[in-house]
């Protein structure tokens, strides 16, 4: 691991994670290049901001669960290769029910150069401290559909409220939201705004 990067769980007490791209449970249907361990990595600045967000979430009865942080460029390249393969239907219903693979890039759900590769972006959700269950958000991680947008109008009231909780927590701790994905947040003051890293997560 390079320079000012760290495993988030080593710096943020109590945070939970499930690194989706290190598992078979993601839109490609298999572990992604560069994810050799089920851990979340980020810059130390990201970790500090997540620590503040975790404390704010706890005040509201929630905890944070991370799905992704730093993403090696080789993983993004893997996404691009996957998008060019024939459709096999294995993950389509769950992750991109109304578009084709190539459209993920056109519609802004996946990018050839990802902010994740700069080390200051996270995919995350809330869970209830009392039960440990994930908060309902009206759609899962990497559901590439308008229902995942922040301005989606068909999200049930309780789920929409949970999205607002997450957004307010993250905004208060220096993060910017992404219009197309309720789970995606980037630290406004990125340490490496123009650098895309490629070291593996191991």
Curated annotation (Swiss-Prot):
Top EC class, one word: hydrolase
Function: Catalyzes hydrolysis of the D-alanyl-D-alanine dipeptide. May play a role in immunity or defense against glycopeptide antibiotics (perhaps at a moderate level) in the soil environment. Might confer vancomycin resistance to S.coelicolor.
Record text on cofactor binding: Binds 1 zinc ion per subunit.
Amino-acid positions noted as binding Zn(2+) in the UniProt annotation, renumbered to this chain: 116, 123, 184
EC number(s) per entry: 3.4.13.22
Active site: 181 (proton donor/acceptor)
One GO BP annotation of this record: proteolysis
Keywords, in A-Z order: Antibiotic resistance, Cell wall biogenesis/degradation, Dipeptidase, Hydrolase, Metal-binding, Metalloprotease, Protease, Zinc
Catalytic activity: D-alanyl-D-alanine + H2O = 2 D-alanine
Family recorded in the similarity comment: Belongs to the peptidase M15D family.
HAMAP family to which the protein is assigned, alphabetical: A_A_dipeptidase
Cofactors (names): Zn(2+)
Keyword Protease recorded: yes
InterPro entries on file: A_A_dipeptidase, Hedgehog_sig/DD-Pept_Zn-bd_sf
Record flagged with keyword Hydrolase: yes
Pfam families with a match to the protein in the record: Peptidase_M15 (PF01427)
Protein known as: D-alanyl-D-alanine dipeptidase
Entry's Gene Ontology molecular function annotations: D-Ala-D-Ala dipeptidase activity; metallopeptidase activity; zinc ion binding
PANTHER family: D-ALANYL-D-ALANINE DIPEPTIDASE (PTHR43126:SF1)
Sites marked Transition state stabilizer: 71
């Amino acid at each position: 691991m390079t320079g000012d990067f760290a495993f988030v769980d080593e710096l943020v007490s109590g945070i939970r994670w499930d690194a989706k791209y290190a598992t078979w449970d993601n839109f490609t249907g298999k572990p992604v290049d560069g994810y050799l361990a089920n851990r979340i990595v980020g810059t130390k600045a990201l970790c500090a901001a997540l620590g503040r967000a975790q404390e704010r979430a706890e005040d509201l009865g929630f905890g944070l669960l991370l799905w992704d942080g730093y993403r090696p460029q080789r993983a993004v390249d893997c996404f691009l290769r996957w998008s060019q393969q024939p459709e096999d239907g294995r993950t389509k219903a769950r992750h991109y029910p109304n578009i084709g693979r190539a459209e993920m890039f056109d519609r802004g759900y996946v990018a050839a150069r990802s902010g994740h590769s700069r080390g200051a972006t996270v995919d995350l959700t809330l869970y209830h401290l009392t039960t440990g269950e994930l908060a309902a958000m009206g759609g899962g991680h990497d559901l590439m559909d308008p229902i995942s947008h922040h301005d989606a109008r068909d999200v049930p009231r309780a789920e929409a409220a949970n999205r607002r909780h997450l957004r307010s927590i993250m905004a208060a701790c220096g993060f910017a939201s992404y219009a197309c994905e309720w789970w995606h947040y980037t630290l406004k003051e990125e340490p490496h705004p123009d650098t895309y890293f490629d070291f593996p997560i191991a």
